[in-house]
């Protein structure tokens, strides 16, 4: 099977490999300009991610879905471990130390939830009607980890889980009566829900929302991240400042240059032309995921690929719009680009899942 999978990928999907290689190369190049040691560490994580992806390719996706509840349970347990014993850094408790490195279970919950919702919303691999009980169970399975992750605090990943859940519910189709009741109920309880949510947000999260509404009101405080990101993007011009030429990074004006705002760094260095190239490569990967879903006649493969497509599409859209100041800074990383080992492994593993679906669905 191993040789068959490799031959299939090289023969049928060379453009996919070129696009993926281009994005990973851009990632390392950009991180090198921020700090060479970051590029070296990210390169190691990319290699680890590729090995994990190779493992995913060897296991039929139907077998992975059959064990979805076990996968979900393991990752959910790790989230509780983070609450009790997690490593704390910069006011956030998100990591578990394993030897010389750390893992971030919240990132793995993205893939675990995709498996779990696929298994839950299907019955023995067959599509079934969305019942109130099925909806409630899926919602609880999403909200529980989302709540634990938001309390770390990691609002960005919690938002991503909610988006993945929404994608699945939309795919299942919601009766108009349920939509109407949900809208009326949502509007009626929104003021109360907003007050509860606002009361549980950390102060820096509130600051990000205030900064989104009016970043210029406090340019050295709440609006600093957004303003510096927009300056970085604007100063890139058409063709950028060149490798390691990003002044926002060189003079340390841009916080989170290697994580949330790495796309701003790349745009300042390579300009509009570089940004267009990167977005084109990402758009191709999203298109590949969407096409995988649409071409798969197996409901299991369809739902899995749709979940991956939603994860990549909204992940890169939210991050790009956040960098441009169109959305508030919620901490959603750019897939395959933001620095972080766990996020890189999950992103590469998700793409490997698409190839897995394409290969095994045709056998």
Residue ranges and their predicted role:
Residues 1, 31, 317-363:
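A juxtamembrane structural motif centered on a specific transmembrane helix
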Residues 221-244:
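Extracytosolic (periplasmic/ER-lumenal) interhelical loops and adjacent juxtamembrane/interface segments
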Residues 154-159, 241-246, 257-259, 276, ...:
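Transmembrane helix boundary and interhelical junction motifs in multipass membrane proteins
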Residues 1-20, 64:
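N-terminal membrane topogenic signal
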Residues 237-273, 293:
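Long extracytoplasmic/lumenal interhelical loops at the membrane interface
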Residues 6-11, 69-77, 231-238:
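Alpha-helical transmembrane segments of integral membrane proteins, especially early/N-terminal helices
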Residues 16-225, 264-325, 349, 353:
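Hydrophobic alpha-helical transmembrane segments of multi-pass inner membrane proteins, especially
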